[in-house]
Amino acid sequence: MLGEFRQFIARGNVMDLAVGVIIGGAFATITGSLTEDVIMPLVGALFGGVDFSNRFILLGSVPDGMSATDYAALKEAGVAMIGYGAFVTAVINFLILAFIIFLLVRWVNKVVRKPEADASPAGPSEVDLLTEIRDELRRK
């Protein structure tokens, strides 16, 4: 049983998957930072300095002594709200990650593409075969 498990783990697909998951996790951190630290501030600047990470719609009442403008504090206090700014950030992060993975898969497919098989000489056509059969039958 241990030998079978070793063979299973040593197969290329399992190791490739493990490496892909680890690299994917690290890459998600990079794209998250790109989204939050570079792209979203630019988007916010285009919309007049709006900070999307702090955009939300209150659904419940704000506890006494709390400001109704701090998303993180309200979320920590358990106030019912829709944090659409965080959602927009997550969607942009996903789109960036999906596009980069698309480019990576496209590049790998070009690199790994198998060379086309050499055109082997074509065999006789149907007409040639039928003519040969006809001639053979005439000889009999």
Curated annotation (Swiss-Prot):
Signal sequence range: none
Family recorded in the similarity comment: Belongs to the MscL family.
Gene name for this UniProt entry: mscL
SUPFAM superfamilies attached to this UniProt entry: Gated mechanosensitive channel
Listed GO CC annotations: plasma membrane
Identification of the protein by name: Large-conductance mechanosensitive channel
Transmembrane segments: 14-34, 85-105
Keywords tagged on the record: Cell inner membrane, Cell membrane, Ion channel, Ion transport, Membrane, Transmembrane, Transmembrane helix, Transport
Subunit-structure text: Homopentamer.
Membrane topology category: Multi-pass membrane protein
Role of this protein: Channel that opens in response to stretch forces in the membrane lipid bilayer. May participate in the regulation of osmotic pressure changes within the cell.
Location(s), subcellular: Cell inner membrane
InterPro entries from the UniProt entry: Mechanosensitive_channel_CS, MS_channel, MSC/AndL, MscL_channel
